[in-house]
Amino acid sequence: MYSPHSNLLWENEDLTIVTPVNPHIPYKDGLHLVVAPKIDLSSAWQDTDFSSYAFKVAAKACSIMRTADIAPWFNIQANGNWGLLPGKKPFFHIHIYGRNKTDTWGKPIVLPMAPNTYNNKPMPEADQTKLKNLFKTELTT
């Protein structure tokens, strides 16, 4: 489900890849992308074939970004927890955190505890354009 609080980087008939307008981590620490299905899917185990496909697309996106020297490594995290927020219901989605070259490999993402407490600027337009072009030409599913 494509969020109006995100910028679309890539889509096909099944999935979208977006970058949040207010990402979970500052851009100096890395990038934040979200892979989300276009179907109503509350959890990965609700449709294991589809969720496996979504993880494959997320891994391929990471491979493309690594080859393009955008980030040397990534944290990939699956969520379906937004039903915890008022007015929201759970939906399956995958977060990709491209990590900064200066970070120690394996360093975990540290997120604030409360929702709506991220105060980070969006990915720069030039970098969004670069990813759009890379994904358009190289991310085939």
Language-model-detected regions and their locations in the chain:
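HIT superfamily nucleotide-processing domains
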Residues: M1-T141
